[in-house]
Amino acid sequence: MMTRFACLHLFTMFLFTLLSGSSSAVITTESPLSMGQTLSSANEVYELGFFSPNNTQDQYVGIWFKDTIPRVVVWVANREKPVTDSTAYLAISSSGSLLLLNGKHGTVWSSGVTFSSSGCRAELSDSGNLKVIDNVSERALWQSFDHLGDTLLHTSSLTYNLATAEKRVLTSWKSYTDPSPGDFLGQITPQVPSQGFVMRGSTPYWRSGPWAKTRFTGIPFMDESYTGPFTLHQDVNGSGYLTYFQRDYKLSRITLTSEGSIKMFRDNGMGWELYYEAPKKLCDFYGACGPFGLCVMSPSPMCKCFRGFVPKSVEEWKRGNWTGGCVRHTELDCLGNSTGEDADDFHQIANIKPPDFYEFASSVNAEECHQRCVHNCSCLAFAYIKGIGCLVWNQDLMDAVQFSATGELLSIRLARSELDGNKRKKTIVASIVSLTLFMILGFTAFGVWRCRVEHIAHISKDAWKNDLKPQDVPGLDFFDMHTIQNATNNFSLSNKLGQGGFGSVYKGKLQDGKEIAVKRLSSSSGQGKEEFMNEIVLISKLQHRNLVRVLGCCIEEEEKLLIYEFMVNKSLDTFLFDSRKRLEIDWPKRFDIIQGIARGLLYLHHDSRLRVIHRDLKVSNILLDEKMNPKISDFGLARMYQGTEYQDNTRRVVGTLGYMSPEYAWTGMFSEKSDIYSFGVLMLEIISGEKISRFSYGVEGKTLIAYAWESWSEYRGIDLLDQDLADSCHPLEVGRCIQIGLLCVQHQPADRPNTLELLAMLTTTSDLPSPKQPTFAFHTRDDESLSNDLITVNGMTQSVILGR
């Protein structure tokens, strides 16, 4: 009897467990949704259930894409108040109201409406819309699409209604682990034509530009031929709605992040592809250059004033604070003279995102649009835009951006004197300046030449050769200068391959037909005798398929040359940062390059006769042979140690900003882990296609490392991936590589993997430790006034070459 009772008890417990983890089709008054249960859409595209975004006892009811990893939540019911009781459940009342009940604590959340109904149910559609439906009329009594969260899904809409003062907006999460309402709203405006805004409180944060039939004119990839997933309708009664229809992809979404970014995703079959994000760069942020300021969109965005305008505050402008904008250099004279020869006229500027505060004039043609503005002295600018018609500006031109290709033609009213100018005066000034500069340069060049001649006269022609003998570098050839000059066509510009940190590199061909690369040390560079001798001696002792091979050297008078094997494909940066050539290295090839560099590092750190710390590992020092195999080059800054030594300290900090580990940049301490840090930066560059010294994200100017950490924390890093690789990558492999890259750039050297561990991480699928949030110490820029190479000499430390 006891045995039978025990079996019955076990069966009951098993049945309860099975039911508690089951998936329901609908929620009714008789069948609520308990914690552990889920509600799936008909074709199992979406799922409703309880979840915890921060892996705590805090539970929320939400909707997410079913069977996608990581989970992407698109709507949350109880955003402001989580439940903590495991007995909580989602129910539907007899009056059609959805209720989230937290055990004995009562109602936590309610849909807030009641209906006269004989019966109703809640079900989840394949568009991700949770609906309460009347069982008799089949009419939707309530739906989640009317109460948006942070995500816009297929067939959902942003709306406004001036008569009722109602609007439907996106509201960001407070953080990526806190779904309560954050600081940002995404909405459309009631002006005609409407435009999209991200608002931070009551302050504009980002603007889409006015709607033009099928596109937003302020989003660069939406040109005149664009037909995308949006439709916008505005009526004369003061209401409008923007609907998102994405028919080309099964899964897609538009999310307003906790940091105020609009991100557009689509599932390409291999994972989420981030195909648009804003704001991202300076010009994306609302009013970055202030009134009458123009933000020029480029790899290094910059502000300038429209023609005829000058900075309102020159001092603030010089400090990089452009928000004060610009003011007119010469006031208009429209009222006094509107038709004569000295009347104001219009200056045209192309590829413009239409500024804010426009007014819709009519759908007339371009010439009539021009005439309307000419005869209205309050009209400061106009634009005739396909899909809109005539827009005019009677207020300050705010949030104007100039794109590199797409955009609209904007005509700005200027005083006649600003357009005519004084050409003769400009010519005279230019001639005087040119002549003065020529004379200064001539005298300077003559003085430098005289000093060089006098200095060289005191140097023995064979001084360098006496310091370096063939027996010191077995296997290397000594070339004479005449041979190298013939091979490189006397170092002609047509033979120049590029400019390195310590000089120029030229392509050459020896008499036997062998192609070579010649590194010619610049006399003005920071690499002197120590680095040059170091590179020759070191590289002669290293042989590995992922290290560049040196063939010989040439030392005559002040000339110092290194002769390398020629790399057909030059350096990795020529591919990675070129908009066309980057397409030649898909994800499998980039992953091979990452592994090849790691193998080269392993040889330097562990497998060679000498332990070598490179100290200047960066993308321009990775050369590619004809099969795109990577080879580490440029050993001028490397250090060699015996097998028991693992770190050293120098007072001479040399390297490249962005790639230098914190302990090396700040204290001069370097080790194998310093190269690991540089490798981590290099990995993130290869994955993203972005340059560490140029990348700047958000209004805070986040570095590539900061953005990689944020991306990995929120989406396992998939939106960091170069968008050109979407069709060739495996998301899990990319996410793993980003995690490895973040492990390599940890602040503490002890938290970084060594080279053996690094290669194991790249070649196996073993579990990886979770990285800590890195310290984003350096944010460098490629400004003309800054050098990419940091060579700060506070003393001299002599290299010591010891056997392993």
UniProtKB/Swiss-Prot annotation:
Source taxonomy: Eukaryota, Viridiplantae, Streptophyta, Embryophyta, Tracheophyta
Annotated family: Belongs to the protein kinase superfamily. Ser/Thr protein kinase family.
Record-listed ATP binding positions: 497-505, 519
Cellular component per GO, a single term: plasma membrane
Catalytic activity annotation: L-seryl-[protein] + ATP = O-phospho-L-seryl-[protein] + ADP + H(+); L-threonyl-[protein] + ATP = O-phospho-L-threonyl-[protein] + ADP + H(+)
Domain Protein kinase: from-to ranges: 491-776
Modified-residue entries (Phosphothreonine), positions: 650
Region (CaM-binding): 580-597
GO MF, one annotated term: protein serine kinase activity
Subcellular location: Cell membrane
Name of the protein: G-type lectin S-receptor-like serine/threonine-protein kinase At1g61500
Catalytic residues (UniProt): 616
Domain EGF-like, residue spans: 279-315
